[in-house]
């Protein structure tokens, strides 16, 4: 157990730059390029495997990815507010995720509507499903 953890910033440290892509290129990216950039940026650990909720191993390819665009926890923020404000960024994210698996499920609240993403990877099928009800209706495990 830590009593404290101190992280010192190196004043001579260099910025890290990542490759960038326009919206039309995202769905055509190679899954290994996506994985490499997610890992280098530290975002790989945001993914969770089921049933044990661990970060996936590098190189692992899921049968499907579930994007939970709802939260039914009491007093939870409605993610649709942010998604609607940044719809292009949300769709770009779905296009990138589509390169990682053959199926992507976007799960949203029954009262919300999401326009379908314009372009996904050629090998991917993206499905939209709506859910209603109180908690735990918004949990990924419930959607699976």
Segments the model singles out, each with a brief description of its role:
Residues 2-144:
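Buried, small/hydrophobic-residue-enriched core segments of structured protein domains
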């Amino acid at each position: 157990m830590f009593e404290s953890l101190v992280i010192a910033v190196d004043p001579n440290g260099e910025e890290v730059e990542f490759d960038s892509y326009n919206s039309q290129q995202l769905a055509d990216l190679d899954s290994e390029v996506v994985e490499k950039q997610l890992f280098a940026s530290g975002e790989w650990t945001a993914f969770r495997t089921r049933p044990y909720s661990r970060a996936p191993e590098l190189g692992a390819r899921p049968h499907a990815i579930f994007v939970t665009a709802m939260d039914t926890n009491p007093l939870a923020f409605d993610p649709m507010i942010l998604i609607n404000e940044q719809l292009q960024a949300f769709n770009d994210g779905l296009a990138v995720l589509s390169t990682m698996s053959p199926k992507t499920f976007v799960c949203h609240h029954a009262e919300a509507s999401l326009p379908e993403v314009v372009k996904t990877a050629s090998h991917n099928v993206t499905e939209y499903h709506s859910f209603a009800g109180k908690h735990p209706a918004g949990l990924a495990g419930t959607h699976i």
